[in-house]
């Protein structure tokens, strides 16, 4: 990222306070962790705008960071927010207790689904809007094929991102709308005293099909347990049905496949 010029409104708050840099996760943002707040710096996008707006709409309905300041300078967004208490669900403490971890993932989903989204004015998370963003990403060479699941592209998969986009447009499933996080993976879920204490990285949050979050959660659990994200040995033989049993939901192979493939274009 180019040399940064922290906006005065934010600089006046953080001053010269000490901070660390958070390198957990797969986003291209720079995240600075202070004692009492977090500063996230990244290229401006639909998601950065949505994060500030959806946070105001959600308010105290969910444990999410409070936005202190949001500024955009030269195409770079700066979001200063309160810091969430607790530990990420991808921490060793939880990965070493798989059944407990899976219950907590389900607890977080249920918490999201309890929120009434009928009056939510932000619709960028709906499938029709997500496909528009996906098309923009494809047309502007913003899709990172190296991070895709091995079966998505290649001999038995799609030829390229354009072919995948065409398939997604032609195979849209009916939506069962709930409030979704949008990127419901373990690093974005915090726990304290065995309860969900917060959700972070909410730029994709909004009304969408519940399988948007279920699919990403299953993938995150699978790869955190099999060592792909940690770089270590396999910890646990995860079966998606373990999470679905906690949610009392049957496996929907069509929607699972669809939302995993959709995420490949982001």
Regions of interest found by a model, annotated:
Residues 1-28:
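A short alpha-helical cap/connector motif
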Residues 2-11, 111-181:
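An alpha-helical support segment within catalytic cores of ATP-dependent transferases
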Residues 20-122:
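ATP-binding pocket architecture of kinase catalytic cores
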Residues 22, 245-266:
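Charged phosphate-binding loop/patch that engages nucleotide di/tri-phosphates or the phosphate backbone
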Residues 101-105, 157, 210:
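An acidic site on a long C-lobe helix of protein kinase domains
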Residues 176-180, 192-244, 248-251:
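Active-site Asp-x-Gly
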Residues 184:
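Hydrophobic HxD+1 residue recognition
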Residues 187-191:
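Hydrophobic residue at the +6 position relative to the catalytic HRD Asp in the kinase catalytic loop
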């Amino acid at each position: 990222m180019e040399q940064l010029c922290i906006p005065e409104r934010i600089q006046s708050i953080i001053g010269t306070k000490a901070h660390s840099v958070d390198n957990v996760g797969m986003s291209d943002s720079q995240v600075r962790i202070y004692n009492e707040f977090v500063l996230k710096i990244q290229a401006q996008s639909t998601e950065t705008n949505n994060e500030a707006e959806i946070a105001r709409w959600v308010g105290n309905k969910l444990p999410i960071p409070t936005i202190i300041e949001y500024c955009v300078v030269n195409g770079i967004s700066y979001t200063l927010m309160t810091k969430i208490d607790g530990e990420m669900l991808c921490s060793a403490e939880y990965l070493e207790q798989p059944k407990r971890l899976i219950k907590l993932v389900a607890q977080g989903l249920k918490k999201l689904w309890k929120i009434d989204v009928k009056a939510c004015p932000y619709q960028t998370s709906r499938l029709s809007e997500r496909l528009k963003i996906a098309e923009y990403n494809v047309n502007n060479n913003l899709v990172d094929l190296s991070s895709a699941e091995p079966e998505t592209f290649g001999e038995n998969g799609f030829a390229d991102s354009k072919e995948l986009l065409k398939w997604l447009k032609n195979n849209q499933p009916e939506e069962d709308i709930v409030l979704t996080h949008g990127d419901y993976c373990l690093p974005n879920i915090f726990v304290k005293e065995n309860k969900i204490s917060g959700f972070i990285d909410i730029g994709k949050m909004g009304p969408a099909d519940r399988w948007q979050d279920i699919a990403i959660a299953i993938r995150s659990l699978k790869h955190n347990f099999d060592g792909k994200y940690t770089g270590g040995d396999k910890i646990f033989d995860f079966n998606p049905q373990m999470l679905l049993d906690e949610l009392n939901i049957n496996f929907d192979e069509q929607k699972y496949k669809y939302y995993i493939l959709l995420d490949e274009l982001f």
